[in-house]
Amino acid sequence: MIAGIKQSKKALEASKVKLAYVANDADENVIKPFLHLCKKKAVEVNRELDMKELAKLCKIEVPTAVAVVTISNVVEI
């Protein structure tokens, strides 16, 4: 899992993202280009968590607006 908009965007541009998390309390001006790129790359976006919950999911202390699950993190069953 990658946290942070810059690193998440790089992974998305490289087509390595399976699922994107965008915090529901993130600044829309900040995440709008990222959401557009998710749509362009046909990546599902989950907006159920806020920035603090997303940080907890990523096991980091600083709230984050964006995180992604990369293809290498996904195990098919």
Which residues fall in each region the model found?
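Short basic, glycine-rich beta-strand/loop surfaces that mediate nucleic-acid
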Residues: 43-77
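Ribosome large-subunit tunnel/peptidyl-transferase-proximal elements
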Residues: 1-17, 27-29
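Feature captures the catalytic cores and cofactor-binding loops of soluble hydro-lyases/lyases
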Residues: 26-52
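Alpha-helical transmembrane segments of helical membrane proteins, especially in multi-pass transport
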Residues: 21-22
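Signal for well-folded cores of large energy- and translation-related assemblies
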Residues: 13-16, 39, 59
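Short, flexible, solvent-exposed loop/turn segments with mixed acidic/basic and small polar residues
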Residues: 9-11, 33-34, 56-58
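General secondary-structure edge motif
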Residues: 17-18, 34
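Aromatic-enriched hydrophobic runs in primary sequence
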Residues: 3, 31-36, 60, 72-74
